[in-house]
């Protein structure tokens, strides 16, 4: 980060931090914006060292401007950041990003006017851009595209497979190229022949449209003048390299290389949409996926969507939050609908990582512990149990702490010779006589039982006199052995 942060120093850094991001806003540019711009340039295969000079910033803006109409918010933000940095290098006093863009636009218009005036003043001079250069004899010659450039282009196509970042890479590698150079780059692509056929169809359509808008003038061509290029000439199929150089260096020039490049970029946009079959609705953040990686996948897919910029803005505002995981979604909704992408990424930084998991786990454990403590406290609020001394019979202390003289014998029955644990008072069997009298009958027996009675004898004997049982019979009944539980429960009807 140190090397990236050393782009601005001293007064330039102070001027940079005074510029606001938006007109009337509160946020200003900071050092982290330079670090972010450097990383984005590396993603687009551009040298971050270009940010250190105003000329380098101008070259970066020139490379990014063709893709601004179809680019994502990140690409537009990168262009605006570089434009503001250019004003700082040139010591142009600006207050916000919009004012910086207006200043650069004015400067470009003035530069274009100066170029036109210079061309009108000196028609003998011709422009020279690599790969078309002027040799020692003053002739315009062409230097073929280098093998290193071709290798970089092939590597990008093989690795990225026509992902959205292929277009800025093609624009950077084909700077100043002739139609022949562009065809060489396209011919080096070995695979993806279906995509190449789609690209050829797009080029043929644009060439036919060029021929329709630029009809051939009637009559022969005047001596010393070049014929007007047709669509096939711009595509490099019916024109020679010398004719292409002449058109590009003539006054006024016909930039056949730039025209052909625009056609190729238009075809590449169609291929990118075809090679991105995933819908933006299917881009959802995984439960453990960092928010930054999710945003990268989201905007990469959004870049290939066939929609207007307004629709893409709506998708960004709605789907980016809706398809986030529950942890990030809670944070994003708390920020509100007007939060910027920078605020979202800052708020969700670290969500899903080890630190975040440990923090969430600690909070959950803290809640569980607090719940257990509250339950324990609530359980202790019941009525207090009174203790009673077995020695003196008083409440409030135990027998081992009793100050009264030691009671001899059993504390239950009062007899000597045994202890409470060996006392038989509480071990009386069902039919024994040791049952404690003060407790009454067992709970499974009726306390007051009404003895069943039989109707009087006279009701069956139709008025005959009934005789009372003799005393002799009562004596016999008393002497009979107990053949039932009559002795315990009273008269048993079944025993008679």
UniProtKB/Swiss-Prot annotation:
UniProt entry keywords in alphabetical sequence: AIDS, Capsid protein, Host cell membrane, Host cytoplasm, Host endosome, Host membrane, Host nucleus, Host-virus interaction, Lipoprotein, Membrane, Metal-binding, Methylation, Myristate, Phosphoprotein, Repeat, RNA-binding, Viral budding, Viral budding via the host ESCRT complexes, Viral nucleoprotein, Viral release from host cell, Virion, Zinc, Zinc-finger
Any one GO biological process: viral translational frameshifting
Dimerization/Multimerization of capsid protein p24: annotated segments: 275-361
One Gene Ontology term of the molecular function aspect: RNA binding
Classification via SUPFAM superfamilies: Retroviral matrix proteins, Retrovirus capsid dimerization domain-like, Retrovirus capsid protein, N-terminal core domain, Retrovirus zinc finger-like domains
Residues with PTM Phosphoserine: 146
Region listing for Interaction with membrane phosphatidylinositol 4,5-bisphosphate, in residue ranges: 73-77
GO cellular component, one term: viral nucleocapsid
Protein name, UniProt field: Gag polyprotein
